[in-house]
C-alpha cells in the first residue's frame, strides 16, 4: 500500500509541475522568440546556463522562500507536496524555455518563412505553427517530466521525505538504500525504470 501511495504521489507532483512549467515556458519562449528587446541575447544565455545549475540549488532557493523566516513562510507550504511541485516547476522552467527556443529558432523560423512566402493569412499562421511543431513540443514535455520524476536533491530539501505525505520514489530509494532495505528499493527502482523506459520509447516514437 505504501509503495502504491509513493508511486501515485510521484506521478501527481511530477505531472503537475511539468504541466505548469510547460505551459508557462511555452508562452514565455514564444514571447522571447517573437519579440526583439534589450538584453534578449543575455536572457537566452542566462536561461541556458540555468539548465546546468545543480538541482539542489533550486531546492535550496525554494526552501529559503518557504521557510518560517522566508517571505512566504506564512503560507506553511514547506514539507508539503505543493513545495515539491514548486521546486520542480522552477527546476523545469529554464529547461522548457531553452528547448522551446531552440525549436522555434530552428524549425519555427522555417515555418514562418514558408508562411510568409506563400502569403498565408496571419490568422492561420498560429494554427499551422502549432500543428507542425506538435510532435517536438510533446517531446519537450516528456523530457521535462522525465527530469521531474527522477529528481532527488531539490525534492528532499523541500519535501522532507515524510512517510505518507511527501515521500516520492527517488527519495524512498535513497532512504531505503541507506537503511539497508534493498528489497523495497529494488521494487521502487524497477517501477521508476519502467516509467523512464516508457518515456524514452514515446520520445523515439515522436522523434
Q: Residues of each region from the PLM?
A:
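Transmembrane-helix boundary motif in ABC transporter permease subunits
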Residues: 16-47, 106, 122-125, 129-130, ...
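Interhelical loop and adjacent transmembrane-helix boundary motif
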Residues: 1-2, 158-205
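Residues that define the loop-to-transmembrane-helix transition and helix capping
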Residues: 12, 38-41, 54, 81-82, ...
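Periplasmic/extracellular loop-to-transmembrane helix junction in inner-membrane transport proteins
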Residues: 1-16, 34-37, 129, 178-181
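C-terminal transmembrane helix and the adjacent membrane-cytosol boundary/short C-terminal tail
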Residues: 94-128, 185-207
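Transmembrane alpha-helices
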Residues: 19, 99-100, 122-154
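Membrane-interfacial helix termini and adjacent extracytoplasmic/periplasmic loops
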Residues: 58-89, 158-162
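Hydrophobic alpha-helical elements at and bordering transmembrane segments
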Residues: 3, 7, 11, 43-49, ...
Amino acid at each position: 500500500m505504501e509503495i502504491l501511495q509513493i508511486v501515485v504521489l510521484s506521478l501527481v507532483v511530477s505531472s503537475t509541475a511539468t504541466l505548469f512549467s510547460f505551459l508557462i515556458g511555452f508562452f514565455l519562449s514564444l514571447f522571447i522568440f517573437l519579440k526583439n528587446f534589450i538584453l534578449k541575447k543575455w536572457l537566452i544565455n542566462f536561461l541556458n546556463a540555468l539548465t546546468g545549475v545543480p538541482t539542489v540549488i533550486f531546492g535550496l532557493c525554494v526552501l529559503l522562500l518557504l521557510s518560517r523566516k522566508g517571505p512566504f513562510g506564512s503560507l506553511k507550504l514547506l514539507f508539503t507536496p505543493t513545495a515539491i511541485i514548486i521546486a520542480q516547476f522552477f527546476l523545469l522552467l529554464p529547461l522548457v524555455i531553452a528547448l522551446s527556443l531552440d525549436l522555434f529558432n530552428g524549425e519555427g523560423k522555417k515555418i514562418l518563412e514558408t508562411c510568409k512566402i506563400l502569403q498565408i493569412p496571419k490568422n492561420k499562421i498560429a494554427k499551422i505553427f502549432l500543428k507542425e511543431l506538435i510532435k517536438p513540443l510533446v517531446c519537450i514535455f516528456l523530457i521535462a517530466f522525465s527530469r521531474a520524476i527522477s529528481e532527488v536533491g531539490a525534492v528532499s530539501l523541500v519535501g522532507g521525505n515524510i512517510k505518507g505525505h511527501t515521500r516520492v520514489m527517488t527519495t524512498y530509494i535513497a532512504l531505503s538504500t541507506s537503511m539497508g532495505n534493498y528489497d523495497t528499493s529494488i521494487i521502487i527502482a524497477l517501477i521508476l525504470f519502467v516509467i523512464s523506459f516508457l518515456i524514452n520509447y514515446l520520445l523515439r516514437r515522436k522523434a
